[in-house]
Amino acid sequence: MAFELNQFGIGIKTIEPGGIRTDFFARSLDTGRHPAYEVLVNKFMGIITDPKQMATYSSPEQIAEVVYEAATHGKDQLRYIAGADAKAMYAMRLQLGEEAFRKAMAQQFFGDAPKAA
């Protein structure tokens, strides 16, 4: 979309944050639990809300700084990786390649490879 809109003077920025230390899950998330997804949702939530994992997350202010930079610096840069954990994941994605990275993430979060592309 960035290529198409550029001809109209519209810039696109993609912010890719990692985890963000907030209480969002505790106060806002309604997973709409369905029995078919309960095991999957519980495993995923257990990983992302683990205190050790959460210690690697960025503060909201750190992410806001990246958003502000993307919006104001005037560079022709599409992707902004925000947070140390996001940068590590992005580096792993580049190293492994997209398909191997997706399989590794599926294994970590769900215990098996993705069922559909």
Regions found by a protein language model. Give the residues of each.
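SDR active-site lid
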Residues: 6-77
